[in-house]
Amino acid sequence: EAACGQCISLTCDVSPTGVVYGSPTTGHAWSAYTVPLTGFWDYVKEWGGDWMWEMIYPDLGHGFDIDWMISALQAGTLVGATDGSYDRSRNAFVCGAGWIIMDTTTGDRLAGSFSEHSPTAGSYRAELLGLCAINVLLLALSKAGNISSCPSITIWCDNKGAVSRASENSRRIQSGRSCADILRVLRTLRMELPVPVTFIHVHSHMDDKLSWEQLSLEQQLNCQCDTLAKDSVSRYILNQTSNVTRNQRLLPKEAAGIFVQGTKLTSDPTTALRYLLGKHAAKQFLCSEQG
């Protein structure tokens, strides 16, 4: 019953061996217990970007076992949903993403959330980060299950811009595009994935207009992802971890990144590099006898 509850967002702490559950803010009651991690997550983290997995909510029935996800992937019953959160009034440099992977036959699900500190933080970037996280998991699951082909997987997202960009099949990402770093990773994942992925737009905040029972599956998942994403931003603001560390994070499968004064550039580096070189030249001139 709890695994199919209406509430994914939990009050929880992380222990070295897994996630310790407390009580949810809404929905069904959850029992407090610890779920051990599996080697699968160590494998995922080898691709880099382990900060994306800062909070994982395993299915209460299966824990961190991945067999049900591999079976659902092969059967074509696995779906994904993601949502982003950005609140400029609270912190203009932080955005968060929440995601859910679910087996539509059994209702089993895996959820997660994470935040990123970046000068280019925003709703669009948050949505792309969520799409990236799900695609990383799909690739890892396909490799863990030795899957060479399977039915198409649907991922729902409420940002039309993110859905449009993620759906493109371009082999080259223009450096001037917003969030070009994430788009490049999505391209890499798409080229490696043996699983065809379909990105579909879903209307957001439909729970403001309809009761929970009236919502479609994708709308319910979107509402849950919205809560997860908001929680990840709140978690960052409460913890206020080092901004320097946050700015230096690479994405999974991201071979290289450009950093200027400790901050990662997510798009065309020309402007930032020109400014930095100009600043350096001005400093040298003003500190010289001529200046």
What does each model-identified segment do?
Residues 1-45:
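Charge-dense, extended regions
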Residues 4, 132-140, 273-282:
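Extended low-polarity, hydrophobic cluster-rich segments
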Residues 28-69, 261, 268:
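Eukaryotic N-terminal low-complexity, Ser/Thr- and Lys/Arg-rich leader segments
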Residues 35, 52, 57-146, 167, ...:
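RNase H-like nuclease fold core
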Residues 86-89, 131-223, 241:
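RNase H catalytic domain
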Residues 219-238:
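Acidic, Mg2+-coordinating catalytic module of metal-dependent nucleases/exonucleases
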Residues 242-291:
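Helix/loop segments that flank and initiate small ligand/metal-binding modules
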